[in-house]
């Protein structure tokens, strides 16, 4: 299980280091192989490869005549990019993924059980505050 919020830094090449507390699990369950894709909230979703493959199988079986399904398939499968942790626990994010999520130097990695969300740090704080305000209303 992946849980918790961690501030992370992207280096000049677009690599982000996965926090050490998650690395052993990712090496065990996925041999350090991950898949990143986009989310409607303009963040990235990062799954261990075996979990992503199960999601992808389900996505491609959905009825493609449904407009919402096609949009979801185009975004999630279309942007899906395999990542591999290097010896330092870093993964290289493509320029397209970084631009989609507005990732520059500082980011937030949010554990979501079976996956991570990777957010532009300012966008994360804004959305978090909006969600908290919604709960108060």
What are these regions, as identified by a protein language model?
Residues 1-6, 12-13, 22-83, 87-88, ...:
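Flexible "stalk/tail and boundary" regions
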């Amino acid at each position: 299980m992946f849980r918790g919020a961690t501030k992370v830094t992207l280096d000049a090449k677009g690599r982000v280091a996965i926090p050490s507390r998650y690395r052993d699990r990712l090496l065990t369950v996925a041999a350090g192989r991950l898949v990143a894709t986009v989310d409607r909230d303009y963040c990235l979703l990062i799954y261990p490869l075996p979990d992503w493959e199960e999601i992808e199988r389900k996505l491609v079986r959905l009825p493609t005549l449904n407009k919402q399904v096609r949009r979801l398939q185009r975004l999630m499968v279309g942007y899906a990019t395999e990542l591999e942790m290097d010896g330092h626990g870093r993964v290289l994010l493509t320029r397209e993924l970084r631009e989609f999520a507005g990732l520059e130097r500082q980011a937030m990695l949010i554990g979501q059980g079976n996956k991570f969300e990777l957010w532009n740090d300012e966008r994360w704080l804004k959305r978090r505050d909006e969600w908290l305000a919604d709960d108060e209303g």
